[in-house]
Structure formats: C-alpha cells, structure tokens
Design a protein with these regions (language model features):
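Residues within alpha-helical transmembrane segments of multi-pass membrane proteins, especially transporters
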Residues: 25, 53, 74, 78, ...
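"…centered on the first transmembrane helix and the immediately adjacent amphipathic helix/loop
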Residues: 1-56, 68, 72
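Short, charged juxtamembrane terminal tails flanking transmembrane helices
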Residues: 119-124
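Membrane-embedded catalytic cores of phosphoryl/pyrophosphoryl-handling enzymes
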Residues: 57-62, 66-83
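Membrane-interfacial alpha-helical segments at the cytosolic side of multi-pass membrane proteins
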Residues: 46-60, 104-115
Length: 124
C-alpha cells in the first residue's frame, strides 16, 4: 500500500530529485545568463513546477492542496540550509527561499483558479 502511493507520486519525486541535485551541486556547470535577478526567477520557476507537480499527483485529495505548498516551501528552506552548512562554495540565501515561496504561491493560485474554472465547466 505504501509503495503504491509512492509510485503514484513518481513525477513529483522526479522533479524533487532534479531540484535537489541542481541545488546541491558544489559548482554548477551551467552558466547563468548575466541578467540581473535571473537566479531568483529560476528559483521561482523550479518551485512553481514542483508545487504544480505535487498538486497534479495529489488530485485524489483536492482539499489538501495546502500540503503541497507547505511541503514545497519547507523543502526550499531545507535546501538553503543544506547549501549554507555543507556545500561550500554554495551559500544559503533567504532571498532564494523567498523566490521559492513566491513560486509556490503562484502555483497554488494558478491551481485553485484552474480547478474553479474546471468545476464550472463540468457543471454546465
């Protein structure tokens, strides 16, 4: 039963693993464009994708949407702490975590609006 639930979240686990891997590389091999604030945009988009994936995988429990948001935000903070403590020369940054949380909030708003529109469409 436990493994069946885990397998049901394979997309979320894949996105979560990719974010952890990219965030914990000691020296990222991907050079970011020299656009001011691009790293914050990347953080926001990564956590928007993570949250939407969690919401998609947990559609059977539509009233627990907030758990996807809380989990994503806590995961973002955890990654920042790990970077600061164990992954030199990476540094934890509260502004990165704020960007993560903004991505989470946008994902939840988009999801809830989408679900309302879907429900209205199904009623007609």
């Amino acid at each position: 039963m436990f493994w069946r639930k885990v397998i049901g979240y394979w997309k979320s686990i894949l996105v979560l693993s990719a974010i952890a891997y990219l965030s914990l590389l000691r020296e990222p091999s991907i050079a970011l464009p020299s656009v001011p604030g691009i790293d914050k945009w990347i953080h926001g988009v990564m956590y928007l994708i993570l949250t939407l994936t969690l919401l998609w995988d947990s559609q059977q429990r539509p009233n627990l949407w907030w758990i996807a948001g809380v989990f994503s935000a806590i995961f973002g903070g955890f990654i920042e702490v790990l970077q600061e403590l164990f992954f030199y020369p990476r540094m934890g940054d509260w502004m990165d975590w704020l960007a993560d949380c903004i991505g989470v909030i946008i994902a939840i708003v988009v999801w809830l609006i989408g679900m309302k529109l879907y429900e209205k469409r199904m009623v007609k």
